[in-house]
């Protein structure tokens, strides 16, 4: 069993039996974090890139002069990458995933590496810094789209603020968010969010409805287990207002097998 499958196995085990591995977090600390993550409406409208269901994400329509997309955890779905190639002339797409043999699509703009993204570089993993340094010398802006099954936290914590600032738009699927109720997990997860919030702001959130155990209720709050977050770098935001209603008109369920999971009110009100 590889590292990713082992991580997923224990995550599902914790969810199934609702195991609490540390003391519970102070509710005020949790509310403060969620307040920082509430999405805003900016001067850039949101557009849907990718498939109608899984693999499609809402991002700001601010795509001029972006040179590269870095997309770790591609698996067997690459509709997001395909769509961006059509929309951005000359875009180069760098894909990575150790769990598959090849890129799910073939295109002259696609470059695939059989590696996982992580906090170290070895025969199976590389860091975001090492990957970008190897693949591009461009000084223009980049896009990051990351779905790496829980490894997103260590990657963000390990990545320098200067490097994160290279990405104009960042899309990340965050996992195990129901563990925000646990003190130890809260410190780890909140550290990753606080890192990215130094340079970016949240412009969209969409819960993933494919997870069997959709959320944990904690002192009046609902914590969806897996959610897709879209971030826009702060210097691209000229004006912004609060978002008063979800879902967005362009949101679609990740799987058609069940109804979409609507973002709970406290995450945006």
Question: Which residues are covered by each model-predicted region?
Answer:
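Conserved SAM-binding loop of SAM-dependent methyltransferases across substrates and taxa
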Residues: 76-88
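Short, polar loop motifs at secondary-structure junctions
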Residues: 95-103
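Conserved beta-strand signature within the Rossmann-like core of class I S-adenosyl-L-methionine
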Residues: 166-177
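Rossmann-like AdoMet/SAM-dependent catalytic core
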Residues: 3-63, 67-70, 77, 113-114, ...
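Switch II (G3) loop of P-loop NTPases
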Residues: 144-151
